[in-house]
Amino acid sequence: MIGLIKISFECIDSEMFSNLYNSLVRPLLEYCVQAWSPHLEKDITLLENVQRRATKIVKDLRNIEYPERLKILNLTRLEDRRTRGDMILTYRLLNGLEDIDYRKFFTLDDGHYNLRGHSKKLKKFGPNLDVRRFFFSFRVVDKWNGLTEEEVTAPSTRAFKLRYDKAEN
């Protein structure tokens, strides 16, 4: 897809790149990440390298370091986007905004609410098989339990996203 973008447009500025990348390339890189999130370093690097190469399409940014290119293009690392997506889905599940019963994935830890935590902490269970430690229901627990009360009790998904993004930046 990146090759097609390169040969289809003679000169791509950062605004055009953002529109093309966000509509054509990024959806392919983020397809079904809650079901299959890469956990091997080689897979994570491989996906990130696609974005790294894609950001070099903008001629003015070719000689700038990758983290700086991301800031200029208002992009984030794919791993950060996957984590954000996991947190949004967890929020939606726990608040009944999905047609899936969250109890199939999580158990609320009602007995361990303290001043540093929040009221919707999840119990952490060890997986029976090593391969299961990368499943959605296991990989989100630590990150979710580390969120603030303000984030977890957001009144809507949009408010949760805004509060999560504010806390992460």
Where are these regions (language model features)?
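Hydrophobic/basic alpha-helical segments
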Residues: 1-169
